[in-house]
């Protein structure tokens, strides 16, 4: 019987090709709009490290006071050098790392080749285990290397391919800014999006890849300039990179791993105690105004997920509902026009359930055809999101099995 219902439905649809095409197009465009928008929203709103994000915290210390706060009373988003170094020395977290963005030049061994400008971060040794960074070869450096300001480096697999042909380069040397550095680890295609470990400088998303990671104190001692954001509430008294370190300018991102709520509470008390000490010493002339947010809350406070993607998703879902309602209305109008046909079939003995089944089959064919068209248009939509969204966000949208299943 089902094959018979399909045959009747196809005949009915062929009798009104224009109306049939309109209904299929309506569903197809509604599905494509909602799924394309959802693919973007899913990419930008995903948890980059779901198994650990609740244990990663970003501390904020108010070193500027009331005059440097925004309307919401928030302290600076980053840290100055003085506070970051003190938190590192006190080491009240399970794991912790200060970090700032660098852009060193790599001098190839082949003198005929031009230097390579790279991007990366200066971090502490605990950065790698804290963020569960995957390695293709080797590992991060040891804590002793931080203390000794050792000339060691962790590089990306992309840079490893360019410099060493993709071979295991651990133990080999490379020239960075005119100095030899020993490779201790090669990352395994690690480029989390959103780039949660330095939201302040990346805005959460970046098309670029961090190719080098150097010891924080080593980079400072070598005078590697900050390639990220620097915000000041007063002009530094000294010029240059050394003057930046002695100023109240904020340019260092900081992250700490805390196992549970009790550890987070203890760490928050430590931050407040530290601010009290600075107040008593005369450095701060205001009461503590610190923050300690876990990673999801931190990304929310930084508005990592663009608000327009949320609005676009709601609008697209609303459009899908409108399309489905319109299609249902068109089908209902079409079925009501066939009331005489239904009466004749009922007079000949057709059961009410049989007529319902035929109409449902016809509606199902429209839905399947619209869904298939929507699938095709979704693929085209994902390819074209770069025309309306920033490149660093558009490149994250993709068609995969989950999206196909939802479509």
Protein language model regions, located:
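Intracellular coupling helices
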Residues: 6-18, 325-366
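Short, strongly hydrophobic transmembrane alpha-helices
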Residues: 15-49
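A short glycine-centered flexible hinge/capping loop motif at secondary-structure junctions
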Residues: 30, 343-351, 370-378
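Structured, solvent-exposed hinge/loop segments at the ends of secondary-structure elements
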Residues: 37-163, 167, 176-182, 192-195, ...
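Mid-to-C-terminal secondary-structure elements
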Residues: 126-140, 151-303
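N-terminal membrane-entry
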Residues: 302-318
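Hydrophobic transmembrane alpha-helices
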Residues: 317-327, 365-368, 375
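Small-residue-rich transmembrane alpha-helices
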Residues: 363-407
């Amino acid at each position: 019987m089902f094959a018979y219902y399909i045959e009747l439905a196809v005949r009915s649809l062929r009798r009104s090709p224009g109306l049939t095409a309109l209904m299929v197009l309506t569903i197809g465009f509604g599905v494509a709009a909602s799924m394309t928008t959802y693919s973007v929203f899913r990419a930008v709103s995903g948890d980059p490290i779901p198994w650990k994000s609740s244990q990663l915290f970003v501390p904020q210390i108010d070193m500027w006071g009331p005059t440097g706060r925004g309307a919401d009373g928030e302290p600076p988003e980053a840290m100055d050098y003085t506070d970051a170094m003190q938190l590192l020395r006190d080491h009240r977290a399970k794991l912790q790392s200060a970090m700032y963005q660098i852009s060193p030049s790599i001098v190839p061994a082949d003198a005929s080749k031009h230097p390579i400008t790279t991007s990366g971060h200066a971090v502490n040794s605990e950065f790698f285990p804290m963020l569960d960074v995957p390695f293709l070869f080797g590992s991060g450096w040891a804590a002793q290397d931080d203390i000794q300001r050792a000339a060691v480096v962790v590089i990306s697999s992309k840079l490893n391919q360019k410099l060493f042909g993709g071979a295991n380069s651990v133990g080999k040397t490379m020239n960075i800014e005119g100095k030899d550095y020993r490779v201790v680890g090669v990352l395994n295609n690690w480029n989390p999006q959103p780039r949660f470990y330095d939201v302040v400088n990346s805005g959460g998303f970046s098309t670029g890849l961090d190719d080098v990671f150097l010891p924080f104190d080593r980079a400072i001692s070598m005078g590697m300039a900050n390639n990220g954001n620097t915000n000041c509430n007063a002009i530094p008294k000294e010029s240059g990179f050394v003057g930046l370190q002695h100023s109240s300018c904020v340019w260092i991102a900081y992250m700490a791993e805390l196992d549970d709520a009790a550890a987070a509470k203890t760490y928050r008390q430590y931050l407040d105690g530290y601010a009290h000490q600075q107040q008593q010493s005369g450095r701060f002339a205001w009461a503590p105004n610190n923050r300690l947010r876990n990673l999801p809350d931190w990304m929310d406070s930084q508005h990592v997920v663009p608000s327009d993607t949320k609005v676009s998703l709601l609008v697209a879902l609303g459009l899908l509902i409108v399309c489905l309602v319109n299609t249902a209305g068109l089908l209902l109008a079409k079925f009501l026009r066939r009331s005489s046909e239904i009466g004749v079939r009922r007079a000949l003995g057709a059961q009410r359930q049989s007529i319902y089944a035929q109409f449902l089959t016809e509606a199902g064919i429209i839905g399947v055809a619209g869904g298939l068209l929507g699938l095709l248009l979704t693929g085209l939509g994902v390819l074209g999101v770069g025309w309306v969204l920033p490149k660093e966000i558009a490149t994250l949208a993709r068609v995969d099995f989950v999206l196909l299943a939802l479509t």
